[in-house]
From Swiss-Prot:
It catalyses: alpha-D-glucosamine 1-phosphate = D-glucosamine 6-phosphate; D-galactosamine 6-phosphate = alpha-D-galactosamine 1-phosphate. Mg(2+) binds at S97, D241, D243, D245. The keyword Disulfide bond does not apply. It comes from Sulfurisphaera tokodaii (strain DSM 16993 / JCM 10545 / NBRC 100140 / 7) (Sulfolobus tokodaii). The keyword 4Fe-4S does not apply. Activated by phosphorylation. This is Phosphoglucosamine/phosphogalactosamine mutase.
Amino acid sequence: MGKLFGTDGVRGIVNKELTPELVLKLSKAIGTFFGKNSKILVGRDVRAGGDMLVKIVEGGLLSVGVEVYDGGMAPTPALQYAVKTLGYDGGVVITASHNPAPYNGIKVVDKDGIEIRREKENEIEDLFFTERFNTIEWSSLTTEVKREDRVISTYVNGILSHVDIEKIKKKNYKVLIDPANSVGALSTPLVARALGCKIYTINGNLDPLFSARQPEPTFDSLKETAEVVKTLKVDLGVAHDGDADRAIFIDSEGRVQWGDRSGTLLSYWASVKNPKAIKKIVTAVSSSSLVEEYLSKYNIQVDWTKVGSVDIAHKVADENALAGFEENGGFMYPPHQYVRDGAMSFALMLELLANENVSSAELFDRLPKYYLVKTKVDLKPGLMVEEIYKKILEVYSTSSVKAITIDGVKIIGKDFWFLVRKSGTEPIIRIMAEAKDENVANNLVNELKKIVEGK
């Protein structure tokens, strides 16, 4: 049987890999999985092809007897929160998150707002490939798609209920918001305004082509945003990806702070806010060693897991963990919801700053200093990924390092770590290394790239 779902949903280039025919068939499988008369919320980000795909999905769902509600354009976490709080049986989000502009995708959400478990993905794939759809009789096709207008307001109010609004308001923070010309522009400024912030925006208009910057917030794509933070002398900058489930922060000195750094600080803050919670967080093997180094001071256990928000979210929920996060800026705060949420992360960071009464630069300087270097190699036909992993283990495994092989190969040394893994969303192999010496990090990445390329 074939495979549709990757690390985070079904993705592909619109009209090439993610064709109308495939999406119609997939939506019929999704609707059959949820069952006749189930209530399903459909929404999307700003991407090209989004409106086309929404209409196809809604048509496919209607054809198998599902009651369909259209939530319009909204951040993925807003749609997930609406599914959970407004009584839906599930949701379908049209998004490719951080992928380049030509991509779009389908994310399936369960009634708890979390992306469906891997076993349920397999069930939908089985229905898709065997074409066992619960197609209804023509005489039952009398319902229309209904409009759901409460998505954004419900979401923003939910976020605000988890932070001390008055404490943040007293600080009169100046913030810069970079929503990547996508749906983060529809919600994060509303959160900032409610928290009494003076708001600046960059890349704030909706643009399906992501003309100003790539939808993935990286060190390179945020160079201009970081310069604006310094020029305007704001207290905090926040940048989202295409569907605003991530938040990458830029501190008051204009330094881009990667997601495992912000996730570490927010995990500490979650433990302060929820003193009775289990002192455990869940993060992917792609996160830095600084996570354990810092959180161990507060007796917070770190549970490493595979890369992918689906796996992390369900592990956080199953283990009743304090929080979960990825190094890419996706942070999960369980009192709100068990999914990545960019605007919730932003509100929590402002609350942490207000509580600590320090600048954002001073706050991030509390963390151990590591230098991060990343690259990627195209996954060419015939490239044997498992053989690459085996070679890396042969070269780098010694008694003085720790090897983790639950998702690619991660090696942790005294003052460095690296990860090599096949991407679950793109045909590439990702290489990342961190070290307390920048030259060590650069050398590691160069060495690993040669091994991956077979040189």
